[in-house]
Design a protein with these regions (language model features):
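N-terminal pre-core extensions flanking Radical SAM catalytic domains
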Residues: 1-122
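Local cysteine-cluster metal-coordination motifs and their immediate loop/turn environment
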Residues: 109-119, 366-369, 412-430
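Radical SAM/AdoMet-radical enzyme domain recognition
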Residues: 119, 131-152, 159-289
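Short Fe-S-cluster ligation motifs
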Residues: 137-154, 440-472
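C-terminal accessory region of radical SAM enzymes
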Residues: 292-336, 363-364, 369-418
Length: 472
């Protein structure tokens, strides 16, 4: 029997994950790779259309994998030899760890004066990389097998040559998954350009409270611009999400904001407090909510969310999340790890294992939350060293490799905490001190478990759900 890997699939590998099949062309480009064990992958390499494979000689796992890939259309079987693989389908190992997506600041400039900006864009602390630097980043992304970028800034649409970047990304088989924007420059012409080059991203718009948005964004008319952009995206069939930073001036607008966004076509709303980084440092003392005040806002809103018919996907920090139209909610802060778990095998941050952030200076960071921090200033730049190399051997790589056992060895309070198996260490970035020490406990999640807890959230949510269900 002969087997052949169908197009657009190719044999691929990454440093640390060397055995994979992934799509390298067309619409399937969006799909994540399929990873395999060594023995199964070695058998799959014979699926080149020209060498016979005896299914009976395969181990049980490999036979099952062959059948599954045949049913999915990844493989074709034939009793006669077939056309050999195309050159791009042959096995290639990328010189990088596997990066599912890269969050990229294509500029540090912004046309707003946001009071909470992570990268202090209104004050010009960050530059705009040159066009050649951006094109080099795109070439590096392709060389490392990255197929998705999420574009941010500053405000990304202030770049005058976005069209060149959109085209270059498409030419290098990289699609834009999401664009983070303040929406002030989002026009039909921008959407036309994206579609021209084969991109159909979702958009995350900042929307900081109905009737309150302009204050945080620092410019009059910002809310009207966001409203126009939401309706444009809805009209053109582009997905929109919203992010709201909760503070003292907009805390009473949460319910109205969620209902408005749902009506305007946004499918999700993520609510957080502004991080005490960048510009917000000068406003936090007067306008930041205490943790207790934030919990009270969330506690009061959860019943209203259910009363309103769950109008939008929502996440209230780590306290509560729920899908539109569903009562199947979660408490994201809470994990349920087994008592015998080996912490030396658990990453401190699971979420950043296969993602990265590239700053306007080209610095490689685990996520944008590290911007303007000591970690940022100590991190390497892809303008100076190759991305593939930095993904494996750099300060970034050390952060990615940090395990929960490293935290527990340094932080006795965390190691002895009765909530450890529920919190699993919290967030590395949230825990980071002003001098850049990230091997300390996350005070935000500590406060949640010691002062609120899962039971309190569930009591509020369950009572609200019971109130909207028909009485039997």
């Amino acid at each position: 029997m002969y087997y052949r890997l169908n197009e657009p699939y190719a044999f691929r590998g990454y440093k640390g994950l060397p055995y994979a099949i992934r799509a390298e062309r067309g619409g399937k480009l969006f799909d994540s790779p399929l990873f395999f064990g060594r023995e199964t992958f070695l058998a799959l390499l014979y699926c080149n259309g020209t060498e016979p494979v005896e299914p009976e000689a395969l181990d049980v796992e490999s036979r099952a994998t062959f059948q599954e890939l045949l049913s999915q259309g990844v493989l074709t079987a034939s009793e006669a030899p077939m056309e050999p693989l195309k050159s791009y389908q042959r096995y290639h190992v990328y010189p990088s760890r596997y990066l599912e997506r890269v969050h990229w600041s294509i500029t540090g400039r912004c046309n707003f004066r946001c009071r909470h900006c992570l990268v202090s864009a209104p004050d010009g602390h960050h530059p705009e990389p040159t066009l050649e630097q951006c094109l080099d980043v795109i070439r590096q992304l392709e060389a490392c097998g990255v197929h998705r970028v999420d574009i941010t800034g500053g405000e990304p649409l202030v770049r005058r040559n976005c069209d060149v970047l959109f085209r270059a990304l498409s030419e290098h088989r990289i699609y834009i998954g999401m664009i983070f924007t303040n929406a002030s420059l989002l026009t039909g012409e921008v959407l036309d350009l994206l579609e021209k080059y084969g991109h159909h991203p979702s958009f995350q718009l900042s929307f900081d409270g109905l009737g309150c948005h302009d204050w945080l964004r620092g410019v009059p008319g910002a809310e009207k611009q966001a409203d126009a952009a939401l309706h444009l995206l809805k009209e053109r069939g582009f997905a929109a999400t919203a992010a709201m930073c909760l503070h003292r001036k907009n805390k009473d607008s949460l319910r109205d904001t969620a209902r408005y966004l749902a009506d305007a076509g946004a499918y999700s709303l993520r609510v957080n407090d502004p991080q005490a980084l960048g510009n917000w440092k000068q406003y936090a003392q007067e306008y930041a909510l205490t943790r207790q005040e934030r919990w009270e806002v969330y506690r009061d809103y959860i019943p209203k969310y259910f009363e309103d018919g769950m109008p939008i996907d929502i996440q209230l920090d780590g306290y509560f999340s729920c899908k539109r139209g569903s009562t199947d909610y979660k408490v994201p802060f809470v994990h349920h790890s087994p008592e015998n778990i080996d912490w030396s095998r658990i990453p401190y941050c699971e979420g950043m294992q296969h993602t990265a952030y590239i700053s306007p200076e080209g610095r490689l960071l685990p996520c944008m939350g590290f911007a303007d921090s000591p970690v940022d200033r100590a991190s390497p730049s892809v303008f100076e060293q190759p991305l593939g190399e930095l993904s494996q051997r750099s300060y970034y790589a050390d952060l990615i490799a940090t395990k929960l056992s490293d935290l527990l060895a340094r932080d006795a309070e965390c190691a002895q905490c009765p909530h450890l198996h529920s919190c699993c260490g919290g967030c590395m970035q949230e825990s980071m001190t002003e001098d850049g020490d990230y091997l300390v406990h996350d005070q935000e999640i500590c406060w949640f478990f010691k002062n609120v807890g899962e039971a309190a959230v569930r009591a509020v949510a369950d009572a609200a759900i019971a109130g909207i269900r028909p009485q039997v």
